[in-house]
Amino acid sequence: MSKGYLYIANGRVVTKDQEDSLEPFRTTSFEAPCMWAADQLGMKLYMGINRTYASELKCMDYDITFYNQHIYRSIFDIKTIKIGYQNLCRFLEAHPDISVVHCNTPIGGVLGRICGKKYGKKVIYMAHGFHFYKGAPLLNRTLFKFIEKWMAHKTDCLITINQEDYEAAQRFKLYKGGKVYKVNGVGVNLNSFNGVSVNVKEKRESLDLPENAVVGIVVGDLNNNKNVETIIRALPLADGNIHIIICGFGPLESTLKKLAKDLGVDERCHFLGFRTDVKELYLASDIFIFASQREGLPRSTMEAMLAGLPCVVSKIRGNIDLIDENKGGSLFPPKDFDSLAKELTILADNPSLRVKYGTYNKERIKDYDIEVVKKQMLNIYQEVF
């Protein structure tokens, strides 16, 4: 009988209709390399998802047995966490063939390790960005760091996706014989822009962008962490031809729109909301701008590199792993809008430099090809299993 492999991670809160849906499940890029590697080793695949009738669902990619994990993002919803714990315990009891639990994200990572060791399983934990990091608030640097150090004792294999986390994890004491690894995130499909074409002039006209505008694209939720405020504050100080298109929505949307108006740059800030044509928008832009305060290995930066854009990004974990300064773009302290404005102006005034940086990034991102990550995961699994 094949050994069982269980994959779990936090999930988003969804609508009742989505939760009760019987639509077949398709794996995402988040778990794709892991499921592929386990399948290559002949493991029987199990996966936790937040769907009421999970056990009845079929998977479009692999032969996976699902269960309703009831694991969400909130670290303060004790009732929900308790249900997630109980559901996981019941599932492990009902499937003694499971020998490996691969857990991800804060809540999934804690529950997976506690329950995994409770039932004598090999435990793999993949950290997609520790909540303690350089420049983090005191709570993160104390409570969250303590939790990770404590949970490391229940971890056979700890996988990180950036250099800062890799170095931090090496200072943890893992379960006997445990080991720390680093992989290149969850990978990107190098062919994802194949077949994507755009008439730049028409696309820009549809967005009411001036013909001579230097277009910076901003992608992400409009929340405190993504720090779009710093980008808007940089605009009055930057080259007047720079316009930004902001793809995303969130709780700070109205606040950011008011800020743009108060600073007199509302006509240069184009709030586009949720978009299904983000790849086309990358190709119609000149510069990628990202001011986030905390990331693991940001997918938006990786996609911008794939699109051949120069990247002006915050000097934080993840970004510094991806962007080589003065080769693929530039880095700035997350709250320093003066520095950001200067970097944007330099690129706005130098089209050839934009091309040079973008060309470099298209080559650099090849290290993060999903096929590379699949092989990294397979090598780790072969060691651990």
Mark where each language-model region is:
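Aromatic "clamp/platform" in nucleotide-sugar-dependent glycosyltransferases that forms part
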Residues: F274, Q293
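Short His-centered aromatic/hydrophobic patch
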Residues: C103-G109, A127
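Short hydrophobic beta-strand element within catalytic cores of glycosyltransferases
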Residues: P310-V313, I323
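N-terminal strand-loop element at the rim of the active site
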Residues: Y7-T80, E164-K173, K179-V180, P251
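A conserved mid-protein helix/loop that constitutes part of the nucleotide-sugar donor-binding site
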Residues: S21-P33, V214-L237, P251-K258, M302, ...
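Conserved acidic donor-binding segment of nucleotide-sugar-dependent glycosyltransferases
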Residues: E325-N326, S330-F337, I346-P351
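A short, well-ordered alpha-helix in the C-terminal region of glycosyltransferases
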Residues: E205, S339, I346, L353-D367, ...
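Donor nucleotide-sugar binding/catalytic pocket of nucleotide-sugar-dependent glycosyltransferases
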Residues: Y67-N68, K149, H153-N199
